[in-house]
Amino acid sequence: MPKISKRLASLAGKIEDRAYAPLEAIALVKDNANAKFDETMEAHVRLGIDPKYTDQQLRTTVALPNGTGQSVRIAVVTRGEKVAEAKAAGAELAGEEDLVESISKGEMDFDLLIATPDMMPKVAKLGRVLGPRGLMPNPKAGTVTTDLEAAIKEFKAGKLEFRADRTGIVHVRFGKASFSADALLQNLKTLQETIDRNKPSGAKGRYWKSLYVTSTMGPSVEVDFSALQDIEQGS
């Protein structure tokens, strides 16, 4: 078992074993984010679902109002005039069969892959390469589309795709430690609303089990998710 560093143990000692009010939890994580770089803020949500059943799977997108603070490299598989359209809209990579061939060889210098529907039969053959990395385009995630300009701009502006892992936990980055606490709270609230709005039809019993927020190098802080749900956007 890996040892906890003295620094992390020291920081964790400042945190009480209880669920904090949302803004208080965010402020506490920000205070402990003292690495030499701008740490990423992360939310980890344990849900009462069993993703091995198709009606208990969660996969969707969220458009964070204040963005993520991270740049996203986008690749687009399309054809014809849409290759130039994708590049003009801000995609770092765009191509036809040539890009599919590069990806099949493991050349994946991108964070997100978008495809037009006519190219999905070719992209689908890349499942062994894209699947384990969570990069396979999906209509529900907005990454299979003919409106490339809108999709690219949305993802560049902070739209994120996320899913529950096989244990029913959602892991989402929701900003940077340099963001104001209010901006981070707005992002976290939007994430909570998205998770609630996309509750799987087969979910049984208590849907939310726990919510923790943390930063890249900091300790986790439990959040009172009921208090988060009670917050009205704009309040």
UniProtKB/Swiss-Prot annotation:
UniProt-listed SUPFAM superfamilies: Ribosomal protein L1
Gene: rplA
Gene Ontology BP annotations: regulation of translation; translation
A Pfam family the protein falls into: Ribosomal_L1
Iron keyword on record: no
One CC-aspect GO term: large ribosomal subunit
Role summary: Binds directly to 23S rRNA. The L1 stalk is quite mobile in the ribosome, and is involved in E site tRNA release.
GO molecular function: rRNA binding; structural constituent of ribosome; tRNA binding
Gene3D superfamilies given in the database record: 3.30.190.20, 3.40.50.790
This protein's name: Large ribosomal subunit protein uL1
Description of how the protein assembles with itself and partners: Part of the 50S ribosomal subunit.
Keyword terms: Repressor, Ribonucleoprotein, Ribosomal protein, RNA-binding, rRNA-binding, Translation regulation, tRNA-binding
Protein family: Belongs to the universal ribosomal protein uL1 family.
InterPro entries hit by this protein: Ribosom_uL1_bac-type, Ribosomal_uL1, Ribosomal_uL1-like, Ribosomal_uL1/biogenesis, Ribosomal_uL1_3-a/b-sand, Ribosomal_uL1_CS
